[in-house]
Amino acid sequence: EALQVLRDELPNVDVVISSNYSPRLADALTKGKVDAAFLRREESAPELAYELLVKEPLVVVLPSDHRLATLESIRVQDIIGETFLSVSDTAPALRAVIDNYLKRSGINITPDHEADHLAMGMSLIASTRGVGLLPAYAQNFLPSSVTSRPLKGETPTIDLVLGYKKSNESLILKLLLSRLDELVARVSKKPR
């Protein structure tokens, strides 16, 4: 969607797409290697500015044939005693949201496994028959052996933001920021 917004205004703009962990994206923004990035808010980078795109709810991710998959929604207490997978420190913002949610819920779970990225998480869930908490966008990438269910009750969220260096004077960045409301509206209308 962001590319379409830019192409509408600047059909000859050259955009490079890459995928990386939020801390690395924040570092690239800080060093001026990229003008903008979609990432999780990194508190350790005060020279960056963030524009909120969406608050993503966390969902329970589990094997499709898991006993909890028969439920429409899952109480966080239902995961006690299950093999629990969390994210590693490659995603510190997400890890903090998960850990704080469990703590607020009065649940003390030590992860049995930690995943560095989404594909690893899906593989671990399928192979260990464990459960995990991930942002709702992960539902777009689930293999048939893995499903998701919403959390019952208070649902934690994690911000997806557009990050950029405050001192960046790029005209393309300014254009993207000027069309941010349109971008958010387009993304909000898309079904998950």
What are these regions (language model features)?
Residues 46-52, 56-57, 71, 78, ...:
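Beta-alpha-beta core module
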Residues 1-13, 174, 178, 182-192:
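N-terminal hydrophobic or amphipathic helices and topogenic motifs
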Residues 12-16, 108-112, 159-161:
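Residues at or immediately flanking beta-strands
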Residues 13, 29-38, 58, 107, ...:
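Alpha-to-beta junction loops
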Residues 84-105, 170-177, 187-191:
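Secondary-structure junction motif
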Residues 58, 67, 74-93, 181-184, ...:
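Short loop->beta-strand "edge-of-pocket" segments that line small-molecule binding or catalytic clefts
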Residues 1-46, 115:
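Central regulatory/effector-binding core of bacterial HTH transcription factors
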Residues 2-11, 95-108:
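Ligand-binding cleft/hinge of the Venus flytrap
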